[in-house]
UniProtKB/Swiss-Prot annotation:
Its main location: cytoplasm. It is an enzyme of class 1 (oxidoreductase). Keywords: Cytoplasm, FAD, Flavoprotein, FMN, NADP, Oxidoreductase. Belongs to the MMACHC family. It holds the Pfam family MMACHC. Catalyzes the reductive dealkylation of cyanocobalamin to cob(II)alamin, using FAD or FMN as cofactor and NADPH as cosubstrate. Can also catalyze the glutathione-dependent reductive demethylation of methylcobalamin, and, with much lower efficiency, the glutathione-dependent reductive demethylation of adenosylcobalamin. Under anaerobic conditions cob(I)alamin is the first product; it is highly reactive and is converted to aquocob(II)alamin in the presence of oxygen. Binds cyanocobalamin, adenosylcobalamin, methylcobalamin and other, related vitamin B12 derivatives. This is MMACHC-like protein. It is found in: Cytoplasm. Its cofactor is FAD; FMN. GO terms for biological process: cobalamin metabolic process; demethylation; glutathione metabolic process. GO terms for molecular function: cobalamin binding; cyanocobalamin reductase (cyanide-eliminating) (NADP+) activity; demethylase activity; FAD binding; glutathione binding; oxidoreductase activity. InterPro entries: MMACHC.
Length: 272
């Protein structure tokens, strides 16, 4: 059983080489015990690993779409022979792209550490419950501050106001990155059952909103008007999604491929 931090750091180096910051990725190390403590040891979201087990959170930044994903779309068009053929064969482009990149990373990683599990932001149990709470991972790992509504109540005031959410919808929290604000996404968590890092201390997440009133405004924007993406700009992030990326995610799934057609038909001059 491996206990050395040096091995954990070598694992992270491999991940960072294959999912580089230049191509729009970040990795953040944390202990499973820190996550389980945050969600509650008896919670259905707690993970069945030793407290000192190593985990890595993978998130994407604006460059993932505009650099790595763009290259992937162009390469797929070449492989399939036409952009229309790619559209026909690949129904979930971002998910397919990420699966390809994670498989390439995994092949390299197995040379350093054979035993690991990957949980995605879309990984569900048979009961349709998330296998892991990504926003909690992000806060625990110090990647992004997780603003939870229960921590920003105001004495004598009922908040959030009742009746504004749709049926069966819950008023939920929001994670904001210290550089990208809401212009990022949690993607996956890698868990290494045989790698123990008992002495590792996670960094504290840095808040970009400090006034409770600002936090409540951001949470209301996120919960009530998330489709306009205005919540992403709270905290004045220094990097944002491009116009193309915003349009892509703002379209219905069936219409998203058309946003990307200029990448192969019109050349770079038509892309942000």
């Amino acid at each position: 059983m491996v206990t050395e931090m040096s091995h954990a750091e070598s694992i992270k180096r491999v991940v960072d080489q294959k999912l580089s910051s230049h191509e729009g990725f970040e990795s953040h190390m944390f202990k499973i015990g820190s996550y389980n403590e945050a969600v509650g040891e008896s919670s259905p979201f707690a993970l069945p690993y030793d407290d000192s087990t190593m985990a890595l959170l993978i998130l994407s930044t604006p460059d993932m779409f505009d650099v790595a994903f763009r290259k992937w779309v162009v390469q797929k068009t070449m492989d399939f022979g036409s952009f229309d053929e790619v559209c026909e064969m690949v129904s979930s482009p971002i998910q397919s792209f990420l699966e390809d990149r994670l498989e390439i990373m995994s092949e390299k990683l197995r040379k350093v550490e054979e035993n690991f599990e990957i949980l995605h932001d879309y990984s569900m149990t048979p009961q349709r419950r998330p296998k892991i709470l990504m926003q909690t991972c992000g806060h625990v790992a110090g990647a992004a501050f997780y603003y939870q509504p229960c921590h920003f109540q105001e004495d004598g005031v009922t908040w959030p106001p009742a009746g504004r959410m749709g049926p069966n919808l819950k008023f939920i929290g929001l994670s904001l990155h210290p550089i990208y604000g809401g212009h990022f996404a949690f993607r996956s968590v890698l868990i290494f059952p045989n790698v123990k890092i008992p002495e590792f201390c996670e960094k504290e997440p840095r808040p970009i909103l400090t006034a409770s009133e600002d936090v409540r405004t951001a949470l209301e924007k996120f919960n009530y008007n998330w489709k306009d993406s205005g919540f992403r700009d709270f905290g004045n992030p220094t990097r944002r999604y491009s116009t193309t990326q915003m349009e892509f995610f703002g379209r219905p799934v069936a219409e998203r491929w058309e946003v990307l057609r200029p990448w192969v038909d019109g050349g770079a001059k038509n892309i942000d």
